[in-house]
Amino acid sequence: MKKIVFDVTIISLILFFVQSCSIDENVTTTAATVSKSSTDYIGTYLSACGENKQQAKVVITDSGTEDVATANFHKISHSDSGCSTVLKTIQYNHTARAMGDTTDDDGNSVSKIYLVTVNVTATLNSTYTSSANEDEWCGLSNWEDDTAKDVTGKDCTNSLSESFSSALIQKYDIWHLNGTSFQKSEESTEGYPTTLDGTVYTKQ
């Protein structure tokens, strides 16, 4: 129950933060410049299966707050080259708000997206859970098969090869939607990127 209350509190704080905090000088808040809302991107987008047996997924949903979406970025590792059997999934959860349009370095019309971290979760399948508990991956010893664990703010470099950001971290992104093809940049904490990262996602 405490965990549920904490998560609800974090999400409520983020929605308030997105609506009311003063954005730094890199962010344009003039509503008249916005041609797309973050909710215009609502959908599930999936990348192709990579040679490294990894796949990326972006899930954008309506947060229930005007012009604010929930944006969840999934990094999925598989055991096979066809990406049919999932070994682990890292899910980065954010609130997202479109802050205006710009043109990237390649001439694409993109939306500037202001992100705030809600949390980060890791889900392991049975291939990893025993080792994860024995070696206390991310400082946790209660991993369960196919069950998401909160790794927000944890240093997991020795197990998941990554150190995860804390909640309420502000990030900047750019999004581009062309028909059913979606692209984004690598998020930055220092200002809006100027190039898309090259991964093309297809709307499902």
What are the language-model segments listed below?
Residues S22-E25, C49, G64, N142:
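Disulfide-rich extracellular repeat modules and their boundaries
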Residues A56-T65, S188-Q204:
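C-terminal or late-domain output modules
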Residues K3-V5, L15-T44:
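Bacterial Sec-dependent N-terminal signal peptides
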Residues A32-K57, A96, V200-T202:
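Tryptophan-anchored aromatic micro-motifs
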Residues S47-K53, N72-G179, E186-D197:
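Contiguous, well-ordered beta-strand patches that form the walls/edges
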Residues E66-N72:
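N-terminal mature ectodomain segment of secretory-pathway/periplasmic proteins
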